[in-house]
Amino acid sequence: MILSNDSLVAFHYRTYGTFFLHKNRLHNIYRGFTHYKYYRAGNFPLFSSSLSFLLLILFKENDIIVVMEKKKLRINMLSSSEKVAGQGVSGAYRELVRLLHRDAKDQLIVTENLPIEADVTHFHTIDFPYYLSTFQKKRSGRKIGYVHFLPDTLEGSLKIPFFLKGIVKRYVFSFYNRMEHLVVVNPMFIEDLVVAGIPREKVTYIPNFVNKEKWHPLPQEEVARLRTELGVSDNQFIVVGAGQVQKRKGIDDFIRLAEELPQITFIWAGGFSFGGMTDGYERYKKMMDNPPENLMFPGIVSPERMRELYALADLFLLPSYNELFPMTILEAASCEAPIMLRDLDLYKVILEGNYRGTEDREEMKEAILEYQANPVALKDLKEKAKNISREYSEEHLLQIWLDFYEKQAVLGRK
């Protein structure tokens, strides 16, 4: 290669970045093998668009200007979750992508829904076009599937015709089997996947997390203003629940509690994310249209409004019968709302006693009255919520994801 004395050449490496050098300051060049693209900058001949060689530069101090990036992994995210508002998968997806864009830009190049080569392709939803893409010969790197649900967990959520249930189940597990590795947000899913024939070593548990810049407590004066706007006095006890309006969320118990405790204000944020496909849609719609006077249904709300509702909560209650890994619990904990739950096996594993567990509606009722009468006990429960927030912080989960992607990318090259 011939350069004029004043030519500035920029070699842009596909993975390693860019460096600049002047011919008259070049000390030594060794030949070898790597792939590069060049940009013409000055008076030098045209070359073919790619060439294989290795450029090793030995230079004196200040002789060559070098700007070189450390090799980055390319992670391509595939997700349609944000097409459906008010459900946890979209929230978990956006939190992960936002965290990686913000804090892992030195290690990763993160793209979304692009038909490109990548070190890792991360499937967040099980769309049929994504399923078909797993059969294409083009390089997608290591295929990682995110398991947010199992076929059985759809019971009580979506209204699926009986004759389709078997087809849906086979499709879901076929999709998961197309993946080279699976990530579960619920550790209880691991055994179910193993029973379905997926090797245990092919599954990794990585929990959800939330952004503390987005989900945080509000000042007391702001809470007082919100109570005034809502028409609720300072000493009125408020119980907040959140999630899709579905049978499995325990919405029936939440409504019954409001009926049995007229002196307590109840608020349920959420709606029908899947419209008429929601199991029990007509019945729950009638309930929402005619709630008890002390029960409010604001519907699907913005994150900003949801943060305000968590701030209003004297107690956050999620009476679900079946859960995956609810983002609402992490959001409420990050906003320092005391948390009461139906005592599912999942919570015993992931929350380790940092909540008030209840077995049924009667225990929930007794606990609400107990906390209304005992501010000290409520304050203790609030401190436990802070423990949840620390355990599922961004800082803790960021390194877990970086290590996971690095390991999977290495396996994908073998």
Where are these regions (language model features)?
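Conserved acidic donor-binding segment of nucleotide-sugar-dependent glycosyltransferases
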Residues: 353-363, 369-376
